[in-house]
Regions:
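Solvent-exposed loop/turn segments at secondary-structure junctions
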Residues: 44-47, 67-72, 97-102, 129-133, ...
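N-terminal Sec-pathway targeting helices
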Residues: 2-21
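Structural recognition of the beta-strand scaffold that forms the well-ordered cores
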Residues: 38-41, 60-65, 91-95, 121-127, ...
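Boundary/entry segment of secreted carbohydrate-active catalytic domains
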Residues: 26-68
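Acidic (Asp/Glu)-rich catalytic clusters
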Residues: 49-58, 76-88, 110-119
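Alpha-helical scaffold elements lining the catalytic groove of polysaccharide deacetylases
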Residues: 46, 102-115, 132-149
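Functionally critical loop-and-helix segments that line ligand-binding/catalytic clefts
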Residues: 34-44, 50-52, 172-219
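Catalytic domains of cell-wall/extracellular-matrix polysaccharide-remodeling enzymes
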Residues: 121-189
Length: 219
């Protein structure tokens, strides 16, 4: 007579197999890494309760919007960066790239805010299709020039935030930079992925990195 109940050992083997399978699936689809470091990115649009974040989170890093285009300076940049530092987070600053503005003007704008704010992580350039015209003959050369200016100033290639994989496809220079991808199921097809933006919680973008130590500036 056979029993409809599995023995204890068989249960353990089956459950163990399911767990391993889920972990493998998660790994290949970008949902699991052996160790991941959680972070957020913020701008003046976000009302951030830093005391609450300090009390209830396991965050390791924070990226703060500094500038956009030629003249826009985020009014909360310095405050956000210093508050993030105060609660023990590593901090990076990012610039929102505009295709219709010369690279040098954008770099000078970013540098002026960078001096005033706190940062100990590699700076980032936010490259999004929304509001930008990448069919403009000057757009790609401007971005390439801006990447070069960042590299010369900070001694490393900037992180490139891309709103979609289509940006990566038509700008091959991205492959030489660490990438910050938004809501992409699998990071395995992009070898240089350094940060993944995975969710939005309470109007704040949540990110994670498999190795945040590699994103630190050498000072």
């Amino acid at each position: 007579m056979t029993s409809h109940k599995l023995s204890g050992m068989k249960k353990i083997v089956i459950i163990g197999g399911i767990v391993i399978a889920l972990l493998l699936i998660g790994y290949f689809w970008g949902f699991y890494t052996p160790k991941r470091y959680n972070g957020i990115d913020v701008s003046h649009h976000n009302m951030v309760d830093w005391t609450e974040i300090d009390r209830n989170s396991d965050l390791e890093f924070c990226y703060v919007k500094a500038t956009e285009g030629k003249s826009f300076k985020d009014k909360k940049c310095v405050e956000h960066s210093r508050n993030a530092k105060k609660i023990g987070l590593n901090v990076g600053l990012y610039h929102y790239f505009r295709t219709d503005v010369p690279a040098k003007s954008q770099f000078d704008n970013f540098k002026s805010v960078y001096r005033a704010a706190y940062s100990n992580m590699i700076p980032a350039i936010d490259v999004e299709e929304q509001g930008n015209d990448f069919t403009d003959a000057f757009a790609i050369p401007r971005l390439i020039e801006l990447i070069g200016l960042f590299e010369k100033e900070f001694g490393c290639k900037p992180i490139i935030y891309v709103g979609s994989l289509s940006c990566v496809k038509f700008i091959p220079e991205f492959w030489d930079c660490p990438l910050w991808l938004r809501a992409v199921k699998s990071t395995n097809i992009i070898p240089n992925t350094a940060i993944k933006q995975a969710a939005i919680i309470n109007n704040i973008d949540m990110n994670y990195s498999p190795n945040v130590r590699k994103l630190m500036l050498d000072k």
